[in-house]
């Protein structure tokens, strides 16, 4: 018997109560295949009897899914084309000056969209170089074609010298079951580079039970730095803006686990956190001493749950010349991070020419149009061009576990869809309930500038992004 290049997924995953049953069934099916000396073909049907039994583990898993009563998701018969014309949600003005930055977006329980941004008023600088930064939201009831009036999420008071002076860089998630909203943000007057344990960049937590109409406010600075009490070098941190990832597999108590990343100082890199109570408390994934991107130094990052329940990290580098993303994987079976990989090849990597910038990471279920095969697609948004231009979405197919069981799997194999021709920077995206991609990014648009950004929204189909190679599966 020989293998077809796929590895047995013998991993314990605390999120899957059927994992041991599936492992036993894998063994039984494989043993039967050997005893019968039959070939398990690429389509999962038995071929002619031969003396060399070739076993495709993906097809074994399909048999097991049938035994356990799992049903494969059914794709829409034809994914409709979408109106991809960008819509300005937050409009930066240069005369008089009024700046918006840092996109975040969630889908509410009833299907409406809530977009968020920093209102930086008359300065485009970050917390520490600016005062009175607010986080605003706008709601769309028609899939992003139009947006309502601004609503206040976190109100910065420029006269304050403490926590309430400024709030920005929102990281957001809507709970899948309850609809509760969570925003984690940077707060206060101290900048990231000047933060100390005695006078740190502060951390805010905002929660809403009514679709963002009202918000409860809590300062959680001591709690967040307290995670790293054993690590005094962690003297500055903030949550990476954009999407907080919610697990589809791990549920503890009332909530599915959420993951996010805080950016630590030079020499520390990014630090991945998780919460099992929807942001009330956080822990470091892999422990407080884990450093998944120590060299080159990790910066703002995003995480996404892989189809097997492990956690994929995609990170911006503090070293601009890296020209790409840094990837790593947390493996629940080994309870450890892997060996970081760099994806910076201009042809097959997540290349970003001399540009260090935040972006978004997403993995969605799709159908490959060439053969109707159900699989997953990794999406990574980032500027492609030099000096923050040409925001694009890179995409990479994930057919089975051999495509995502090592960080190096994400170094190559990416293709690209270009979203804009303009100078453009931070971006985020979520998969909506209908399988489309709600994309929200910073774009110089009509501002005749290389760094004054409007925040633009557009709906994109998987079919559009991949030039028809894949179509979405409704989630």
Segments (PLM) and residue ranges:
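Bacterial N-terminal signal peptides that target proteins for export
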Residues: 17-28
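Alpha-helical segments with a strong preference for the paired helices of cellulosomal dockerin domains
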Residues: 43-77
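Short, low-complexity intrinsically disordered segments enriched in A/P/G/S/L with frequent Arg
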Residues: 8-10
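Asp-box/BNR beta-propeller blade signature and adjacent active/binding-site loops
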Residues: 78-475
């Amino acid at each position: 018997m020989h293998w077809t290049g796929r590895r047995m997924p013998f991993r314990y995953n605390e999120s899957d109560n059927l994992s041991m049953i599936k492992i036993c069934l894998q063994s039984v099916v494989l043993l039967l295949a050997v005893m019968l000396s039959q070939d398990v073909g690429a389509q999962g049907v038995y071929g002619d009897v031969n003396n060399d039994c070739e076993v495709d583990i993906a097809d074994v898993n399909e048999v097991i899914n049938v035994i356990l009563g799992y049903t494969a998701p059914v794709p829409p018969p034809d994914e409709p084309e979408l109106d991809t014309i960008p819509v300005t949600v937050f409009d930066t003005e240069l005369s008089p000056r009024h700046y918006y930055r840092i996109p975040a977006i969630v889908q509410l329980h009833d299907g409406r969209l809530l977009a968020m941004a920093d209102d930086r008023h008359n300065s485009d600088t970050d917390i520490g170089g600016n005062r009175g930064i607010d986080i605003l939201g706008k709601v769309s009831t028609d899939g992003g074609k139009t947006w309502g009036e601004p609503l206040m999420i976190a109100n910065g008071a420029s006269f304050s010298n403490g926590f309430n002076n400024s709030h920005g860089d929102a990281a957001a998630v809507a709970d899948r079951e309850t609809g509760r909203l969570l925003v984690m943000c940077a707060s206060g007057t101290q900048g990231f580079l000047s933060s100390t344990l005695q006078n740190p960049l502060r951390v805010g937590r905002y929660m809403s039970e009514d679709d963002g109409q009202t918000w409860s406010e809590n300062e959680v600075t001591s709690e967040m730095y307290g995670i790293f009490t054993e690590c005094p070098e962690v003297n500055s941190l903030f949550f990476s803006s954009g999407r907080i990832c919610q697990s589809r597999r791990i549920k503890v108590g009332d909530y599915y686990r959420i993951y996010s990343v805080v950016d630590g100082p030079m020499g520390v890199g990014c630090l991945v956190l998780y919460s099992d109570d929807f942001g009330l408390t956080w822990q470091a994934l892999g422990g407080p001493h884990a450093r998944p991107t120590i060299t080159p130094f990790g910066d703002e990052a995003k995480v996404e749950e892989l189809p097997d329940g492990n956690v994929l990290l995609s990170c911006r580098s503090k070293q601009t010349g890296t020209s790409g993303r840094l990837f790593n994987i947390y493996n629940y079976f080994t309870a450890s991070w892997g060996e970081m990989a760099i994806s910076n090849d201009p042809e097959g990597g997540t290349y970003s020419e001399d540009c260090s910038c935040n972006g978004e990471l997403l993995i969605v279920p799709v159908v490959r149009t060439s053969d109707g095969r159900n699989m997953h697609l990794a999406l990574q948004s980032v500027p492609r061009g030099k000096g923050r231009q040409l925001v694009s979405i890179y995409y990479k197919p994930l057919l089975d576990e051999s495509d995502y069981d090592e960080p190096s799997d994400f170094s190559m194999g990416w293709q690209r869809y270009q979203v804009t021709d303009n100078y453009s920077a931070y971006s985020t995206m979520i998969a909506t309930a209908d399988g489309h991609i709600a994309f929200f990014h910073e774009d110089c648009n009509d501002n005749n500038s290389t760094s004054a950004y409007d925040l633009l929204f557009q709906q994109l189909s998987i079919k559009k992004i991949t030039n028809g190679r894949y179509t979405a599966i409704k989630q």
